[in-house]
């Protein structure tokens, strides 16, 4: 798997990451969601470089022209609920893409162990298509893998490109091992620590709660 980490190079993306991590800016949930969307634009742009293109003839008001346009059938897939703002940002770039949604979540058992469950899986036929799998936080990588395995019920994609905002080093290593070799991970930042509760450190906290409020 090819891994691309965007904040290794300076760009305005790093300013959005700083706001996402900042405990004071996080108090504005609308701004937090918007910053996730903005990061999605960058991830989608980088993903577009891995796609196939074909020549398209277009007519301008003055003459004819040719442009290379995406020829792959693209499906934007997200892991609910935290994945929605990222999904929206990616969809703003790939605005003709199909859409898929999976609910993958973790349950903490009384003994401290984690259990991951899938309860919702809605997708078009994925056979031979390029799937952009969106989840803002790549912690252990288990929910990402479960989402991918659930989506395989709808056909085998030609390629999977994972798009994430922040991940742990352990999570990156996990998906690198478990996903097909022609997959790609494009991620804005990778943090060094995954704590005993499987939270990314320094991370940014619970992305779903910061987007949509706490849950019982």
PLM features: residue spans?
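PRPP-associated nucleotide enzymes
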Residues: 1-216
């Amino acid at each position: 798997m090819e891994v691309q980490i965007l904040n290794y190079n300076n760009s305005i993306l790093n300013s959005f990451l700083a706001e996402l991590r900042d405990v004071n800016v996080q108090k504005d949930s609308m701004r937090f969601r918007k910053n996730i969307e903005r990061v999605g634009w960058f991830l989608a742009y980088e993903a577009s470089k891995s796609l196939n293109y074909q020549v398209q003839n277009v007519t301008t008001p003055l003459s004819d022209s040719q442009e290379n346009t995406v020829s792959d059938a693209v499906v934007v897939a997200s892991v609910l609920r935290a994945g929605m703002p990222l999904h929206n940002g990616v969809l703003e770039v790939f605005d003709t893409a199909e859409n898929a949604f999976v609910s993958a979540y973790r349950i903490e058992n009384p003994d401290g162990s984690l259990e991951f469950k899938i309860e919702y899986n809605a997708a078009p036929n994925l056979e031979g298509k390029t799937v952009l799998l969106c989840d803002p936080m790549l912690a252990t990588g288990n929910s990402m893998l479960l989402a991918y395995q659930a989506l395989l019920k709808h056909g085998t994609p030609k390629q999977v490109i994972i798009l994430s905002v922040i991940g742990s080093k352990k999570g990156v290593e996990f998906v690198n091992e478990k996903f097909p070799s022609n997959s790609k991970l494009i991620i804005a930042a990778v943090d060094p620590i995954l704590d005993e509760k499987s939270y990314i450190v320094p991370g940014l906290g619970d992305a779903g709660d910061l987007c949509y409020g706490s849950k019982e």
